[in-house]
């Protein structure tokens, strides 16, 4: 009781503007290093516009500094002009935690501090809860939750924003620039998660939770507002292009080298992703429930590129140049051309290691798409940010369409891998229709027999679970079941057989002499999804289920990608897509840096204990060298036996008894 009274007295008479300023100062002192804060201040002050006593950035300044398209239509029809969308987001986030009152905010230094902290996930140093609420905050910034067109600008800012200032056009013009559905009713029935946990945590840290709790109480508008597909499409285009971005890289390099082919690939990728949000008429936009569920379940890392983008604000070229001048190590011409940020040529994805085959499937857009949902390490799951590199293991276009070639290249790879398959859907009559791209993430080595798949797997980290997914024409993700260790031995993660082909997530029947050539020996679907590729590598069956039509399997149902989370079906539903295969590629995952000292992975380059070869590529090459030596040894034995027919038969019999050749060979 006494604590509540103390809280009230502390916040009594304090306005939201003052509390917002206090929070910004707390963020600045606890979430940035002194050097980062000095760089941020230099960047802001060197470009800030001024009206009276207010220093601020407008949309043009922010877009120019970040190096993102600002609506000038340079990139085709403007679907990559994300500057207005980004400024719309920051003018909402800058009002945190008083979005309902202060949004849209003027982008002052305080507002910019809060924007950077929220978009780079640094708020954990100040706010001890509200982690899950970031999605709600991002939805609000896109859906314009809390903005009121009639809301006057605060008195201390209205005088400093005449009608012809860029700042006014950068905030108010955007309100009418995007189609946002407004609430159709004002139901007062509250849900359990109506509280904005992140805003509550901010108020709690300011000892003002009781006084200002009513301001951040999320009303029904957050659940009834919608993000227009046009708004989200522009943001997605930016995220796809900048997915490989690192903090020390210039964003302009990613845009300057875009051509029509890469733009078209990015558009296709964005359209495929948008299908997972499309549960009705696109004119109505994306609701909060759909947005939150799809992001959480199938696109958890989609906003990761915003972190390095806004961390650019923490590096000032001016301060770097001043250091060079003070040290006297650079000439005036060097100072003019010097830039602390490195360049990257995004035309060839740097994630692929040299020496790999020329991919028929992988491009920058596909890699970006994979990075939005596929965890490959811990604690940094994003494959474009955690040092992951891809090594070409198998390509049907390069190595041939045969199980022998697949076996030679894939079964000798003992590290995690990603398999990608492209082809065309086949209708019931067998005719090819639209193209499709599917794939699977296998977090451990492939096995040729199902018996080895019954071993216990360490599932302490998300990246140790398998994934089955569809990239086009729809975005569908089926995550591996956390209870995979409790599954029966006839439900392996992967299975390889010359009789049935390649099976992922299928139920494998027991082998019998009478069923070797019958359908009873064929793998069958299980769980939420499975993939079966025939021995000729020509056709595939991609199976998806809501989990009620089959027994538990390796993969969970696809979730929001195929059904609404609030209206889960109680009846069995499944779909089998028949595919005519064009290309199959398997890419091995190699970690070029040590991600975690506590990682249980055996495939790190740092794992050299007991003389183990530390690199999966080297281990595979060593295995091939061993096979080559054994083949040479068998050839020499054959030649030494003699050339006669009877002698040749005798020599062959000796080799079979030794287990070197024949059906019981150890080297097959």
From Swiss-Prot:
SMART domains: TLDc. Belongs to the RTC5 family. Residues 360-590 form the TLDc domain. Residues 164-177, 513-523 have a biased composition (Polar residues). May be involved in a process influencing telomere capping. Residues 149-163, 323-337 have a biased composition (Basic and acidic residues). It comes from Arthroderma otae (strain ATCC MYA-4605 / CBS 113480). This is Restriction of telomere capping protein 5. Residues 149-194, 323-344, 508-529 are annotated as: Disordered. It is found in: Cytoplasm. GO terms for cellular component: cytoplasm. Its main location: cytoplasm. Keywords: Cytoplasm. It holds the Pfam family TLD.
């Amino acid at each position: 009781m006494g604590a509540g009274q103390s809280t009230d007295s502390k916040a009594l008479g304090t306005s939201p503007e003052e509390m917002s300023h206090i929070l910004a100062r707390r963020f600045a002192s606890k979430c940035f290093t002194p050097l980062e804060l000095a760089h941020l201040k230099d960047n802001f002050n060197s470009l800030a516009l001024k009206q009276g006593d207010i220093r601020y950035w407008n949309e043009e300044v922010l877009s120019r500094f970040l190096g993102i398209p600002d609506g000038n239509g340079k990139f085709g029809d403007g679907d990559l002009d994300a500057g207005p969308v980004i400024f719309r987001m920051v003018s909402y986030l800058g009002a945190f935690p008083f979005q309902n009152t202060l949004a849209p905010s003027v982008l002052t230094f305080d507002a910019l501090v809060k924007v950077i902290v929220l978009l780079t996930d640094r708020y954990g140093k100040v706010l001890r809860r509200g982690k899950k609420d970031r999605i709600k905050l991002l939805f609000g910034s896109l859906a314009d939750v809390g903005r009121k067109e009639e809301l006057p600008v605060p008195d201390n800012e209205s005088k400093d924003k005449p009608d012809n200032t860029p700042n006014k056009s950068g905030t108010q013009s955007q309100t009418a620039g995007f189609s946002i559905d407004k609430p159709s009713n004002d139901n007062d029935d509250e849900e359990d998660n109506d509280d904005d946990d992140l805003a509550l945590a901010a108020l709690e840290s300011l000892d003002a939770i009781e006084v200002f709790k009513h301001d951040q109480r999320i009303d029904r508008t957050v659940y009834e507002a919608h993000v227009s597909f046009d708004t989200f499409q522009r943001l997605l285009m930016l995220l796809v292009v900048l997915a490989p971005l690192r903090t020390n890289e210039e964003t302009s390099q990613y845009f300057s080298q875009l051509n029509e082919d890469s733009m078209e690939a990015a558009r296709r990728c964005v359209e495929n992703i948008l299908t997972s949000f499309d549960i009705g008429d696109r004119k109505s936009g994306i609701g909060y429930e759909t947005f939150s569920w799809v992001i959480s379940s199938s696109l958890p890392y989609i906003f990761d590129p915003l972190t390095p983008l806004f961390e650019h604000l923490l590096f000032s070229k001016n301060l770097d140049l001043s250091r060079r001048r003070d040290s006297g190590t650079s000439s005036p011409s060097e100072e003019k051309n010097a830039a602390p940020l490195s360049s990257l040529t995004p035309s060839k994805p740097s994630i692929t290691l040299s020496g790999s085959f020329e991919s028929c499937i992988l491009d920058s857009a596909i890699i970006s798409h994979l990075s939005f949902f596929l965890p490959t390490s811990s604690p940094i799951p994003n494959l474009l940010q955690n040092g992951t590199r891809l090594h070409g293991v198998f390509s049907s276009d390069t190595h041939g369409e045969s199980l022998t070639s697949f076996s030679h290249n894939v079964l000798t790879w003992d590290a995690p891998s990603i398999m990608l398959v492209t082809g065309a859907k086949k209708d019931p009559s067998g005719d090819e229709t639209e193209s499709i791209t599917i794939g699977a993430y296998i977090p451990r080595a492939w096995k040729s027999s199902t018996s080895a798949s019954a071993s216990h797997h360490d599932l302490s980290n998300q990246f140790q679970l398998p994934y089955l997914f569809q990239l086009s024409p729809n975005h569908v993700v089926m995550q591996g079941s956390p209870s995979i260790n409790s599954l029966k031995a006839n439900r392996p993660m992967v299975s390889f057989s010359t009789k049935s082909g390649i099976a992922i997530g299928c139920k494998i029947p027991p082998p019998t002499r009478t069923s070797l050539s019958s359908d009873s020996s064929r793998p069958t679907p299980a769980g939420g999804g499975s993939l079966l590729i025939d021995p000729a590598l020509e056709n595939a069956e991609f199976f998806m289920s809501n989990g009620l039509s089959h027994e538990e399997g390796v993969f969970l149902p696809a979730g929001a990608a195929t059904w609404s989370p609030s209206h889960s079906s109680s009846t069995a539903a499944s779909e089998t897509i028949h595919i005519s295969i064009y290309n199959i590629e398997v890419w091995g995952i190699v970690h070029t840096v040590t991600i975690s000292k506590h990682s249980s992975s055996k495939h790190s380059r740092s794992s050299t204990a007991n003389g183990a070869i530390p690199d999966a590529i080297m281990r595979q090459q060593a295995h091939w060298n061993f096979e080559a030596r054994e083949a040479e040894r068998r050839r020499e034995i054959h030649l030494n036996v003699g050339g006669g027919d009877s002698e040749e038969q005798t020599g062959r019999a000796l080799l079979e008894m030794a287990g070197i050749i024949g059906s019981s060979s150890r080297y097959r």
